[in-house]
Amino acid sequence: MTTRTREWLRSFLRLGARAEQDGIPAVDIERQEDTVLRAMDMLDDRPGILLADEVGMGKTYEALGIAAVTRYLRPRSRIVIVTPGPDLNSKWYAEFSRFREMFDFGDNVAPARHLSEFLEKVRNHPVVVAPVTMFQSGRGSGAQSYLLSLYFHWKQLHGHTANAIMARFRDGDQERVDVRTAMFLGAFTLADVEPHLARAFRQGRSSGAAGLDDLYEKGGLSAFENMRAVHNALYRARFVLTGRLMPMIDLLIVDEAHKLKNPGSLRTRAMQEVFSRRFRKTLFLTATPFQLDVTELREIFSLFARAKGAPDDLAQQVEGFLANIDEYKRTYEEFQRTWSSLDPIVAVRFREAYDRDPAAAKQLDDPGIAVIFRHIESLRELKNSSIEPGFRQWMIRSLREDKRTYRRHLPRDIRAAGVEFLPFLIYERFIAELFRRKRQTHKAAVEINMVSSYAAANQGTILAEDDGIPIEAEAYRVLLRQILGEMESGPQEHPKLRDALSDALDAADRGEKTLIFCSRIATLEQLRRKLDSIWECRILERWRKVYPDAQADEIFDTREEDETRQRGRQSLLQARFRKSQDVLYLALREFHCRTVVTAADWACERLEEIIRRANILLQTLRVGKTSAEGIDYQVAKRCVEHAASVLWLEEHPETQPSETLQNLCNPDYLRFGLDLDEDDYEHDSAGDEQPRWEISERVARIVLGDRGSLWESMAGLLEKLPPDLRVRLVEQLARYLTYKQVSFLADLLSEALAAGLSVEPVESAALLEFMPKFWKTPCGQSWMNQLRAFLEYFVERDATQQTEILDGPIKRGDFARHTRDGESRERLREAFNTPLYPMILIANEVMQEGLDLHKHCRRIVHHDLVWNPAQIEQRIGRIDRLGSLTNRLRKNDATVTLDVLYPIIRGTIDERLFRVVKSREKWLEFLLGAPPNFTDYNFTEDPPISLPDRLGSELAIHLGPKKRAK
């Protein structure tokens, strides 16, 4: 047998192929390689493993690496990847294309969306990617009637008995189906399914829901009046038949496996029934193997037990392991209580002594030290004999060793004082009265509404609905509605909302993006509205640096009562940058003689000939009326650039022109531009009139462009794009810079004013001449750096992602977005991953998992806290990933942090939420590899002294791919 080493792995799998483009350090590539190798070794002698790396460490690529090794070793093997839903299914399928540089799966990968499609694909393709949501189909009456009729056929129930069952099912609304002609999932005949009907309709020795025959034999006809039991039996039959019709799977990969923790959920039952004994090996991916309690692992192991050839005593092994974990947790809690009760002076002495020499620490003269050492020995024994070996038998988990250094957790203490706190007090009294009158309500949920926003509280059930409110509580509700209404319409702001707005806007002013997680829809929408409104006020302040006394209606457009548009300074100046009859049109466009052929200086020496040729070309064109009557700088630019490029090639015949240069020399360039295609960027330059103006020397020099223009320094990046995409990108960015919500125009005028230019009025020619100087100012450099960073990100995306970016929020210049905007997750992701707008993304639960939002964001706000620490970690994992902005910045500045903000309104449920989620996080962290930490998970006024570093390292459970050196 071949020895599996890194060298062997690299002979066919190059996990580091994209390391440089994606900013992945070599050490992480090696860790991923080690993970793949260890996973393959583990799968040799066990049915399944958990790949549980912390969020953002590349589990997807590790899983693809394991799939690649499986296909390499067994070219005929079948692999199924089950994803959490349609969006992530598309993402996984797309990852195979990106993975091609590392290992080429060829055309063997197929996506599936529905169960029937999955069965067809899995029978005909070696690798299939399918969402677990495909199992949620089959609720329709047609599918259920077919399965009941199939049962009648198998059971040989005819006439009155079958009709009596149908009469009891769904109120007798459905009719029997002729199973001789009908097909299972629209594809499988009676002959296909008949061999598997006994397994489908009888539970036998398997666990789970009872079969239809079990119900009938036990309860007769009346059993079919229990709709829940019948539905479960029908689902069971559907899942069993699906599994029996599916070929054997060699490797089953399950993404976000923690979603299967609930044994009663439909997706968990489906996975158990469909894949029972239909796979040989399985790989479960999750950064949070358990969320609220370690016993959630039991469900994962129960799925491992469904593998073909799984050991019969697997369940007993698991129960023994969980019992050991319980003992370990009790010992740990005792140790924490003892340590916390130590005199701080003694604790400091112990810590210092233990870090030098544990034996010396044992000699300290204090009775508590002996107890401490007994706990340490007990923990060490349990860890080494059962806990670490038990986890390592089934799990690989790599940690971000420096995560606890660069992550900065910042609880923000928000105090609601005076009238601000009145709604909270009345709300509490209202809820208390409901409880006193035995009106059922979920107290925590309604309290969370109130700490989220007044809008969320108003839209909550107990305020929005009138039914069932006791008369004694109604007075509080009426008062609360009145107060909340006055506060929402007045100047008084919700304290947490005010904090969130101020924090995110201040960050945006510094050029930093913010990801806000908010689970209340009303709050999400209110945040978006207010962010846009306040940001407009901040943009106005930038304009006032140029026009100090200007009011909003002088700067921005307004609408009169008759809907007549009154244009402001911003809109008027924006039009000049976009209208090709104004010389400012050239300010943000690409000068091709400086970016494509770099021949502008050469052309200036031959200007007379170029002007002669350009004017001849000009007269061959037919343009619109406006462009015919006066200079159109887009038309003039194309004529001069085409003439100069053709002449340059004539004098340099040895040159092998690029596609872009060829397009520049193509006669169609005159009419359609660099993409040689008629589009929306031609403005008024298309028509049937002959130009009645000529290109002068002054105009020719202007359209050739001055040295130091915007795109000149980015020519190398632009050259990586095809001409059509290049044109679209430059035009869209030129428009983006002039949007109302973007401060570029105000910043430009501010710098122009400082340089002595007139801004009353703004002179186009003077401002255009100033542009190269502007790009050299600190302000201009900042804008240019943003655009360069955008380009660097953009050119590394695939064609689909590039389209998502250009069609996304950047197209409208949206400052803030939320996940209720109807935008696809991918489009929002791509836009947020650029340094341009949106600067703030307000996300709900949809964005918590599976999306990478880390390229240009290192700030996250948990506006609405949750009870589950795994959800908190998944949220943070959106921006804490390999190749993140934080990682890149820390290469040059080790003080850079990833900031995690927890806004907490004092005296409200926020405080309890924070304590509970942090207490639960302790076990998620400690049992899965982090050193024990008593300080971060302490909520007393006097936190205990931190443990010795040496002891923390000794007690940390190591689950990485390589064994830790003794």
Feature-to-residue mapping (PLM):
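Helicase motor interdomain insertion/brace
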Residues: 1-42, 47-51, 57-836, 844-852, ...
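Short beta->alpha connector loops at strand-helix junctions that form conserved
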Residues: 863-866
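Conserved SF2 helicase motif VI
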Residues: 868-891
